[in-house]
């Protein structure tokens, strides 16, 4: 059932009585997840990532935590690993490529457009592509991260709406946070404002509305990019919190919002060499962005990148001869 709405004092911004729900991966359907995302903005899916996959990905990534990256936007007690596709095939194929995550991203981020080429009409439906990926290790003493919307870098300006009016195309990015360790309020769990994806993007965050995204190892948190969120302080005595995050973005722009910049947040084309791209499955090569978007955006020498680099498989937009 959709959450009830009340008007704020200025009569402009709906205040959504939303919540953070936990669903079991063994019983939940894709339609269930879509419903919770539309109405609440985020949802925890328990037991989505197996122990075997976490061990494989951890063996690839965790050694890099010792090679510290300058924290930048993050606390000095936060260690981050970047360029994950260049460090872990398993991360790309089994976490970023998780079928539930990909199906959810397809639903919210796939564009649909019709256009004419001469006397023939075509329908274009380019799928979303990789936006970013990071691994986080937060240590005791880690500071609170400011609340923010993931889509702010794409200048995604949105009006307030009711949950039943949520249109596909409103969000430009969608993310998944994977718990490698138990994640609690005390050791730095993500703070999340349920329903904030329905607010105007001009509204500031209200810390009093946050809830901690507490998870066990193997659980994931799926979140629309217009939701306010941010890491909590790690006030535990000795607990390290390890989290993998990855986001996908629309590969083209629909005019449902006044988004001005739609580029991938992480420049994967400089961080992942072509020889590394060849190692991935054709499906993941496309999802990482090494493929033309339907009908033929992202070409090299007016050809699909797959042909230029002799990558296997066909792209989505090869039906128009340019």
From Swiss-Prot:
Similarity comment text for this entry: Belongs to the PhyH family.
InterPro entries per UniProt: Phytyl_CoA_dOase-like
Role according to the record: Polyketide synthase-nonribosomal peptide synthetase; part of the him gene cluster that mediates the biosynthesis of himeic acid A, a ubiquitin-activating enzyme (E1) inhibitor. First, himA, together with the trans-enoyl reductase himH, catalyzes the formation of apolyketide chain, which is then condensed with leucine by the NRPS activity of himA. Dieckmann cyclization and release from himA gives a tetramic acid intermediate as the product of himA PKS-NRPS. HimG then catalyzes alpha-oxidation of the tetramic acid ring, with a subsequent rearrangement to yield apyrone intermediate.
Organism ancestry: Eukaryota, Fungi, Dikarya, Ascomycota, Pezizomycotina
EC number of this enzyme: 1.14.11.-
A family per Pfam: PhyH
Gene Ontology biological-process annotations: biosynthetic process
Binding site for Fe cation: 148, 229
Protein name as it appears in the record: Dioxygenase himG
Gene Ontology MF annotations: dioxygenase activity; metal ion binding
Subunit record text: Homodimer.
Cofactor field: Fe cation
Keyword Oxidoreductase attached: yes
Annotated pathway: Secondary metabolite biosynthesis
Keywords: Dioxygenase, Iron, Metal-binding, Oxidoreductase
Gene3D superfamilies in alphabetical order: q2cbj1_9rhob like domain
